[in-house]
């Protein structure tokens, strides 16, 4: 089966077919190229996906990824990154082993095809030229024969005519002979050209064309084989990465099998364990008995002297409920009056209604009375320190000793801080050793440097080490203090704590026992000696650095108000004061007389003029 013998007359169709074969090969190259682009795009998307879900450094997410399930997820992301790398390998191998190779082969194929069809067209043109020569000699031979016949007939006619001279007859005879000779020459030439054409035609159809078509056939078959080999390479490139992709998938399975739910549960305990003991039983409060209270100075003095107030606010049973009390609620209990404001006096006389028909002095809420008694004892200092620490936490300030955290979390933070400081100390010590060695080298070889130039740096490093050690001792002391307070402390510590509780009146040590402030922050627990040594000035100093609330306007007292309840302030008719808090709907306005004296007055007793800028802000 040969194109040279079977398709000897299909030159044009073979030319079209071979061009179609090259187009198919180029189309396959384009297909592989688009596949490589898809692989690269897919790999890029996988990498971006893996990067997107990676935990951010120095963020809360990084702390959350300590759980085994999250670690498995990280392993999944890493394996996905490697998986994406294999798709990049597929793209690279296809580009180098298929696209580049086939593109070069297509150029060679086009050149070979062009050469073969050029030879075919050249042979075709040659046979066409021979055919034209044959046709030309044939027409000339035919013309000469006709001319010879006419000359012979003319001679015979002249020879038969008796009226024609002998000279004319001779001339006609010579002309006939010339034409006859020309016909013979044309015949010989035609015969020669015909033989030559037949030979060329035989060579063309039986030698040249078969050889050229055979080359074209071989070229086309090589193209087909090359395309098949490229398809095999295409599959092999994919097959080569399958084992590595399998390892990636095995890694994902292994990471999934490493998930330990029990370990994660333990980590949750370590992350959120507060170290507090569950609250005790709430004592029964009998409201059937009349509550005898007095707010006179004598009763308050007696309460402080005896250390036995009527009610135990913040005792052990209620102290455990501190974590569930909102800070703003506590502040309102401490500062805002708990009675509705009195109506304005019926007459313009300031003495007409001194305190109003519903003055807070006449009736008190039990909770307000408890706070009144609570505020007259020294433990208020610690409670307000706890409150201040909670407020500072809400404002974003974190105490250095992490006292805003529950005991267990505070212990972990302190331990972490101690470890960090120890690492810094070790780093500074290594630096000091390096400087010392360099100084020794300078001492032995003065030409290398001046030893005295390192003294300043050595002193600076030593000073840093000393500072870090002092800092470490401070945090270690806090850590030891916290570890001594955790529920798992020794029996001796428990006995000492019980002795301490029994030696202090309930009202005095209530706030000291409660280690959690109203916002859930952890506060310091003072010993008995420090409790007895605290002076009233300590409480004032504790809040000296608190900035007063800014004034939002002014007010003028319309009537005289004698504020005799906690949180209120006395005003005189016509007095001008600063407004620091508007009426929140309870009928009271918070005002300030100077930097140290402020409180609430009934809104109906004053004429308020708010500053426009402050109101807008």
Curated annotation (Swiss-Prot):
Site (Mediates end-to-end attachment of dimers): 166
Annotated effect of mutating residue 168 to A/N/R: No significant effect
Tissue expression as described in the entry: Very highly expressed in the epithelial cells of the gastrointestinal tract, respiratory, reproductive and urinary systems. Also highly expressed in brown adipose tissue, cardiomyocytes, enteric ganglia and glucagon producing cells of the pancreas. Expressed in germ cells of the testis and all regions of the brain.
GO molecular function: identical protein binding; lipid binding
Region of interest (Interaction with RND2), ranges: 400-552
Post-translational modification N6-acetyllysine, affected residues: 66, 110
Principal place of residence: cytoplasm
UniProt-listed CDD domains: F-BAR_FBP17 (cd07676), HR1_FBP17 (cd11629)
Effect seen on changing residue 166 to A: Abolishes membrane invagination
Protein topology in the membrane: Peripheral membrane protein
Annotated S-S bridges: none
Region described as Interaction with PDE6G: spans on this chain: 495-617
SH3 domain span: 550-611
Pfam short name (any one): FCH
Spans annotated as Disordered: 280-315, 333-366, 486-531
Compositional bias ranges of the Pro residues kind: 338-347
Comment on protein domains: The F-BAR domain binds the phospholipid membrane with its concave surface. The end-to-end polymerization of dimers of these domains provides a curved surface that fits best membranes with around 600 A diameter, and may drive tubulation.
Family membership noted in the UniProt record: Belongs to the FNBP1 family.
Subunit structure as annotated in this protein's UniProt entry: Interacts specifically with GTP-bound RND2 and CDC42. Interacts with PDE6G and microtubules. Homodimerizes, the dimers can polymerize end-to-end to form filamentous structures. Interacts with AKAP9, ARHGAP17, DAAM1, DIAPH1, DIAPH2, DNM1, DNM2, DNM3, FASLG/FASL, SNX2 and WASL/N-WASP. May interact with TNKS.
Protein name: Formin-binding protein 1
Top-level taxonomy: Eukaryota, Metazoa, Chordata, Craniata, Vertebrata
Recorded name of the encoding gene: FNBP1
């Amino acid at each position: 089966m040969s194109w040279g013998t079977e398709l000897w007359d299909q030159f044009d169709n073979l030319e079209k077919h071979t061009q179609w074969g090259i187009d198919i090969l180029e189309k396959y190259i384009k297909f592989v190229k688009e596949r490589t682009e898809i692989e690269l795009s897919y790999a890029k998307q996988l990498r971006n996906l893996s990067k997107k879900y990676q935990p951010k450094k120095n963020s809360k997410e990084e702390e959350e990824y300590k759980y085994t399930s999250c670690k498995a997820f990280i392993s999944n992301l890493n394996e996905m990154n490697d998986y994406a790398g294999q798709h990049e390998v597929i793209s690279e191998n296809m580009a180098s082993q298929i696209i580049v190779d086939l593109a070069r082969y297509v150029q060679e194929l086009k050149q070979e095809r062009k050469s073969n069809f050029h030879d075919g067209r050249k042979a075709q043109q040659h046979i066409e030229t021979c055919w034209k020569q044959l046709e030309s000699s044939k027409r000339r031979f035919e013309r000469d024969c006709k001319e010879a016949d006419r000359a012979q007939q003319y001679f015979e006619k002249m020879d038969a005519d008796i009226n024609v001279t002998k000279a004319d007859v001779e001339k006609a005879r010579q002309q006939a002979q010339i034409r006859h000779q020309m016909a013979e020459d044309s015949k010989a030439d035609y015969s020669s050209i015909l033989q030559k054409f037949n030979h060329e035609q035989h060579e063309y159809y039986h030698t040249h064309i078969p050889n050229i078509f055979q080359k074209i056939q071989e070229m086309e078959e090589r193209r087909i084989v090359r395309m098949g080999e490229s398809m095999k390479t295409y599959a092999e490139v994919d097959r080569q990465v399958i084992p590595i992709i399998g390892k990636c998938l095995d890694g994902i399975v292994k990471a999934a099998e490493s998930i330990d739910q029990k370990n994660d549960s333990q980590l949750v305990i370590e992350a959120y364990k507060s170290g507090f003991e569950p609250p005790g039983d709430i004592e029964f409060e009998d409201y059937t008995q009349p509550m005898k209270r007095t707010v006179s100075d004598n009763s308050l003095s007696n309460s402080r002297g005896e250390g036995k107030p009527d009610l135990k606010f913040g005792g052990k049973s209620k102290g455990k409920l501190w974590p569930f009390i909102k800070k703003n609620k506590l502040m309102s209990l401490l500062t805002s009056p708990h009675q509705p404001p009195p109506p304005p006096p019926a007459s313009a006389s300031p003495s007409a209604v001194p305190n109003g028909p519903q003055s807070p002095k006449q009736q008190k809420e039990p909770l307000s009375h408890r706070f009144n008694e609570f505020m007259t004892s020294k433990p208020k200092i610690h409670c307000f320190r706890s409150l201040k620490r909670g407020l500072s936490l809400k404002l974003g300030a974190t105490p250095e000793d992490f006292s805003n955290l529950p005991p267990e979390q505070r212990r972990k933070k302190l331990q972490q801080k101690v470890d960090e400081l120890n690492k810094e100390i070790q780093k500074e010590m290594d630096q000091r050793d390096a400087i010392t060695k360099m100084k020794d080298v300078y001492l032995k070889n003065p030409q290398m440097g001046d030893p005295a130039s390192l003294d300043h740096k050595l002193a600076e490093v030593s000073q840093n080490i000393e500072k870090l050690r002092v800092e470490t001792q401070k945090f270690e002391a806090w850590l030891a203090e916290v570890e001594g307070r955790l529920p798992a402390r020794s029996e001796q510590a428990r006995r000492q704590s019980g002795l301490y509780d029994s030696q202090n009146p309930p009202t005095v040590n209530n706030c000291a026992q409660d280690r959690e402030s109203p916002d859930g922050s952890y506060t310091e627990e003072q010993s008995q000696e420090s409790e007895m040594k605290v002076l009233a000035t300590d409480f004032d100093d504790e809040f000296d650095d608190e900035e007063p609330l800014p004034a939002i306007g002014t007010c003028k007292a319309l009537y005289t108000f004698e504020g005799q309840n906690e949180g209120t302030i006395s005003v005189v008719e016509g007095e001008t004061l600063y407004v620091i808090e508007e009426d929140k709907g309870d009928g009271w306005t918070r005002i300030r007389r100077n930097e140290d004296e402020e409180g609430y007055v009934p809104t109906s007793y004053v004429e308020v003029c708010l500053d426009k800028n402050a109101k807008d802000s």
